[in-house]
């Protein structure tokens, strides 16, 4: 198998043997499966893929991704979830993209999703900046492992499935990469698809959604969080106009930003 690439899969209550087969893995993988036990074991698929499984009773997608990062031992890692199915040749496509640009630390790829879940589509090669990190999911990203470790970048335990606040751990990861001076690139190469399923965190544009988004925006944008909050409610207003007034949505985001400021201050005080 391609030892230069490893898929880091965050799973929840899955059968690792069935999962590895269903995902069409072409390279080695680490599966962190959140279950009711704590154990580790390895197996090899029928097409020769080496899979290292780590069952864990811990909860939270951030914990899962960090655990997978700790276990990884290849030059390049690809983040993944248990609802991703890869195209034939995806591994070669990823390795070729990194070979073509030795300066790229993180490369984002297309993963097809249903229209109502689409937040991005890469139609030309571009470099990701701080204003666009919120578009991309973690499962779109492959990274040079050594560079990520050298920069000390980890996934937040505050955001995402199983955490106190809703999604955002992937956006923070990419933002931390940029803040560390790493190069994040997006290429128009499709490597797989996401199978439809109910979201683990999105329950509509309710009060929690907007307040959590405010907390996230503080950690993403700092003193510019309020500006980004205004932009967010204006861009999204058509999606929630029948369930909440724009003024209330913005008020909730402001409350979230304030909560984020207080939380960041407490975290800084513990250092």
Regions found by a protein language model. Name each.
Residues 155-157, 181-193, 205-206:
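Catalytic beta-strand/loop signature of glycosyltransferases that borders the donor
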Residues 1-30:
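N-proximal low-complexity "stem/linker" segments adjacent to membrane-targeting elements
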Residues 77:
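Short aromatic/hydrophobic "clamp" motif used to bind/position activated sugar donors
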Residues 55-72:
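Glycine-rich, basic loop-to-helix element that forms the pyrophosphate-binding segment
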Residues 73-74, 137-157:
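Conserved nucleotide-sugar donor-binding
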Residues 85-121:
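Conserved donor NDP-sugar-binding/catalytic core segment of glycosyltransferases
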Residues 160-172:
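Acidic donor-binding loop at a coil-to-helix junction in glycosyltransferase catalytic cores
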Residues 204-271:
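Non-catalytic, C-terminal membrane-associated alpha-helical segments of glycosyltransferases
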């Amino acid at each position: 198998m391609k030892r230069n690439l490893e898929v880091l899969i965050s799973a929840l209550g899955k059968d690792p043997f069935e999962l590895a087969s269903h995902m069409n893995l072409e390279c080695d993988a680490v599966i962190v499966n959140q279950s009711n036990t704590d154990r580790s074991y390895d197996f090899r698929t029928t097409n020769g893929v080496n899979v290292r499984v780590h069952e864990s009773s811990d909860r939270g997608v951030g914990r899962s991704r960090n655990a997978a990062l700790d276990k990884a031992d290849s030059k390049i890692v690809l983040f993944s979830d248990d609802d991703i199915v890869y195209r034939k040749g995806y591994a070669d496509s990823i390795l070729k993209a990194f070979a073509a640009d030795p300066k790229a630390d993180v490369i984002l790829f297309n993963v097809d999703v249903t229209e109502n879940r689409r937040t991005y589509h890469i139609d030309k090669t571009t470099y990701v900046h701080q204003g666009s990190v919120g578009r991309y999911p973690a499962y779109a990203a492959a990274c040079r492992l050594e560079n990520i470790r050298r920069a000390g970048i980890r996934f937040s335990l505050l955001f995402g499935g199983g955490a106190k606040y809703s999604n955002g751990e992937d956006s923070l990861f990419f933002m931390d990469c940029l803040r560390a001076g790493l190069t994040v690139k997006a290429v128009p190469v499709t490597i797989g698809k996401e199978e439809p399923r109910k979201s683990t965190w999105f329950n509509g544009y309710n009060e929690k959604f907007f307040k959590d988004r405010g907390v996230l925006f503080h950690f993403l944008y700092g003193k510019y969080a309020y500006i980004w909050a205004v932009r967010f409610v204006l861009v999204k207003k058509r999606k929630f106009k029948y369930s909440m007034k724009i003024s209330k949505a913005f008020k909730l985001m402001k409350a979230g930003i304030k909560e984020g400021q207080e939380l960041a201050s407490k975290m800084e005080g513990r250092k």
